Regions:
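A general structural signal for short secondary-structure junctions and capping/turn motifs
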Residues: 111-116, 146-149, 164-167, 175, ...
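Short, charged/polar micro-motifs that form catalytic or ligand-binding hotspots
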Residues: 112, 281-292, 333-340
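C-terminal structural cap/anchor segments
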Residues: 297-357
Length: 357
């Protein structure tokens, strides 16, 4: 979901055509699709092609992106958020709403989404029983519009795709301001048609942004090139072994032989050559030490630059003192401290919207 900034005076003068233009320019942000793909295991290596179609072309995905996000998210919000208030009745009413929305799971998914994409969004609405609900919005399903110089929203655009009974692709668009909501629809990629404008009672734009950091950068976004390099070297290692498993046999001065002769040689486990003859496999050679050192360096760099440690490393054994362990986790503690401050801001806005309605 891209975040765009504009002057408040421009928002007040937006026309139906302006809203359509904003959607056309910002829908389907490629950054989010790529990051979501990497988390789910859809890496660039899977689209790698070789010029020689007969050569081994293993495409191995080592999903460090998922490891980084799952580890950082679990460490950050594995324990549920605890709320406190001097007003016990208010806190109890708020907790009822949270329980109704399975707030603990929602928070986990929001934190994971922010870890992947750098930010994540939530929409508040009233269900058919007039109960307050809040739900995560898919990263490619919304456009967040903020006033220049501020992070609070002036408007938000929600986009939902579906199919009707005739399998037509229906695109529904909602343009939310603090006062009303504009409803649009298009069929099979046609022009958006304004259907209705309705007032709402939230008193604000009912959307919340949860950011991972001030730069809105995902936890593994900065190490994607390292992930790609590791995927390549692992794939090439597999190619190397497969090539050697299927290596050609070079034979010099074997003389005239028949298929029967070859069958007998296989049975006896011996090959008879003429004088000066030779036989050897055509194999590739590689330095195991150099290869393993290179892979080790890539793994270490991914952990260093993501600040997410390798928890399976032998150095995380049970013999570490508390001080030594804190040093090992220092980088992760720092990024989680940033996450906590940013996530708290989103939770506060959620509570403000709930309280206002």
């Amino acid at each position: 979901m891209p975040v765009i900034f504009m002057e408040r005076s421009l928002l007040d003068s937006l026309t139906e055509a302006d809203i359509k233009e904003i959607i056309d320019e910002n829908e389907g942000h490629t950054k989010y699709a790529r990051l979501e793909g990497y988390y789910e295991g859809d890496h660039d290596i899977l689209r790698h092609r070789k010029k020689d179609s007969t050569a081994p072309n293993n495409r191995l995905v080592n999903n460090m992106a998922k490891y980084i996000t799952d580890t950082a998210t679990g460490y950050f919000i594995g324990k549920p958020v605890v709320y406190s208030s001097q007003n016990d009745a208010y806190l109890a009413a708020l907790q009822d709403i949270f329980d109704y929305n399975d707030e603990q799971d929602e928070n986990m998914e929001l934190a994971k989404g922010a870890s992947i994409n750098g930010d994540c969004f939530e929409m508040l609405y009233l269900d058919e029983d007039a109960q307050i609900r809040f739900t995560k919005v898919p990263p490619d399903g919304c456009i967040y519009i903020c006033e220049t110089g501020y992070n609070t929203p002036m408007a938000a655009i929600r986009i939902v795709y579906s199919k009707d009974k005739d399998k037509n692709i229906i695109k529904k668009v909602e343009f939310w301001t603090a006062q009303d909501c504009w409803y649009f629809r298009s069929i099979n990629g046609g022009a958006l048609e304004l259907l209705d404008i309705r007032e709402h009672y939230w008193g604000d734009v009912p959307f919340v942004e949860y950011i991972n950091n001030e730069e809105r950068q995902g936890d593994f976004e900065g190490v994607i090139t390292l992930i790609d390099a590791y995927n390549r070297v692992e794939s090439n290692t597999a190619n190397f072994f497969q090539y050697n498993d299927e290596a050609l046999l070079k034979v010099l001065k074997m003389g005239a032989v028949t298929s029967q002769d070859i069958a007998e040689m296989k049975e006896k486990g011996a090959i008879i050559l003429e004088d000066g003859g030779d036989i050897q496999w055509l194999i590739k050679e590689v330095s195991d030490t150099a290869l393993e050192n290179y892979k080790k360096r890539l793994r270490e760099d991914m952990h260093i630059f993501s600040a997410v440690p390798n928890l399976t490393d032998a150095n995380f054994g049970g013999n570490l003192s508390g001080v030594a362990m804190s040093y090992k986790l220092w980088g992760l503690e720092q990024i989680c401290a940033i996450k906590e401050r940013k996530f708290k801001r989103g939770l506060q806005r959620r509570i403000e919207l709930i309280t206002h309605i």
